[in-house]
Amino acid sequence: VVRPAPPGPDPAALEQLTDWVTDAARPVIICGGYGQRAGDADTLARLAEKHALPVIAYRPRHSPIPSDHPWHIGFEVGAHVKSADLIIVVDSDAPWLPQLHTPNPDARVVHIGADPLLSDYVMRNFPSHLGITGQSSLVLAGLDAALSERGPSPYVAKRRKTVDAAQANLREIGTKEVQTASKKSLSTTPWIAHCLNAAKGPEDLVVTEMVFPMHLLDFPEPGCHFGLSPAGGLGWGLGESIGLKLANPDRRVIAVVGDGSYMFGNPTPAHFVCEALALPILTIIVNN
C-alpha cells in the first residue's frame, strides 16, 4: 500500500503567519489535540525554543510539548488570551471557553490543522483571521524554517519576561494547592495529582477522563498522557486504558476517571477483559 503524502501548508498563508509572528510582542500557541504523531512534540518544542513562542496545552488530548520545556506556560488560557496580540490555535476545536475567557479583541487568531475551521461541526463560533490547512507538524516545521530565514524577532526579550512570570506564577499556584490539600482530611484532586506524580515513573502512561490539575503532573517525554477526545464521550477512559495496555504490555497504565465516567465505561466487562487477557491497569476513581 502506497500512502499518500500528508498535506502541506499554502506558501502564501505560511508567509503571512511568519510576518505576524515576527511582529507579535505577545504571541501564544494553544494546542488541544496536537501531539498524536511521533515527532510532533519535538517539532513544536524546537519551534517554541528557537523563536521564543509560549505554548499552552489547553484540555490536551496528548502532550504537545514536554511539561518542563522552557516555553511551556501551563494548561489554562484565561489571562494569556486576554493579553495576547497573536493567538495560534493548533488542532483545537475549543481553544478557549467564550463564557469564561475573553480574548484580546485586537488579537489576530490563526487556526492550523487538517480542517482548521472544523467544517463538520454544526456550529463553532471562534474568530479566525487566517486558517492554514495541512498536517500541523508540517505547518509548524515550515514556520520554523521561515522564521529562521528572517532572524530573531525584536520582541524576544519581552516574550521571555512574560513567560518567566507565567511559569513562576504557575509554580506558586501549584505549591499553594498542594500545601492546602495536604491539610485536608479528604483527598482532593490537587493532592491526588501530587501523589500520582510522586508515584508514577517516566515510562508510565496516564489517561485522564476528568478535569484534572495537569500542572501538578510531570510529562517530560511525549506520548505519556492521553486526555478525553470530543469524539469519545463519557466512559472513554477505561476502554482507552485497556487499548494502551494491549499495545504497551511492558508499560504501566494508570487511568484517572470520575465516578460517573467510571460507570459509563462499563467497569464490569472492562475489568473482566483485563483479567481474561492479563492486562492489568491501575484505575483511580475520583468521587467528583
Task: Name the predicted role of every residue range.
Residues 30-31, 55-58, 89-90, 132-134, ...:
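General beta-strand structural signal in soluble alpha/beta enzymes
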Residues 57-163:
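Glycine-rich, acidic loop regions that bind phosphate or pyrophosphate groups
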Residues 1-21, 172-176:
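Conformationally flexible catalytic loops at phosphate/diphosphate-handling active centers
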Residues 38-58, 201-204:
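Redox- and metal-dependent alpha/beta enzyme cores, enriched for Fe-S-associated oxidoreductases
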Residues 164-250:
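Active-site diphosphate/adenylate-binding microenvironment
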Residues 83-95, 213-288:
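Thiamine diphosphate
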Residues 13-27, 47, 195-202, 245-251:
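Glycine-rich phosphate/diphosphate-binding loops that line cofactor/substrate pockets in enzymes
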Residues 25-38:
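Glycine-rich phosphate/diphosphate-binding loops and the adjacent beta-loop-alpha structural elements
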